Swiss-Prot record:
One of its GO terms (cellular component) is cytosolic large ribosomal subunit. InterPro entries: Ribosomal_uL13, Ribosomal_uL13_bac-type, Ribosomal_uL13_CS, Ribosomal_uL13_sf. Belongs to the universal ribosomal protein uL13 family. HAMAP family: Ribosomal_uL13. This is Large ribosomal subunit protein uL13. The lineage of its organism: Bacteria, Pseudomonadati, Bdellovibrionota, Bdellovibrionia, Bdellovibrionales.
Amino acid sequence: MKTFNAKAEEVERKWWIVDAAGQKVGRVATHVATILRGKNKAIYTPNVDTGDFVVVINTDKMELSGTKWQDKKYYSHTRFFGSLKEMTAAQAKEKDSTFIIHEAVRGMLPTNKLSRHVIMKMKAYTGAEHPHAAQKPALFTLPSKK
């Protein structure tokens, strides 16, 4: 018996839709990262993109536990002296709520060339409407907390 190695052109990709309303950011991000990498499939191969497309809706209604809205900070730097900018999670939600889920999922992916390609398969939207109805995404229900 030979070891199976998936090929990128042979992978069938599905579209999933995840409703983030009332869910914790970390719980949504872990499941989205798993689907994006393809670890929920039997044909998972670490060096091949075997993951599916994910549409995350209602990112403006996500929750953070405790005082993370004020305590969690996002940093950016332009590499010029004195240009370190910081933004709290509340400010990020006010500016663009899709940024929070995007950064959470990006942090859960490995840092390599493949992850830069994988993160582009995630689409996040603030409301319930999205332009991907033609792909007929299936609803992904998050498992209940034990």
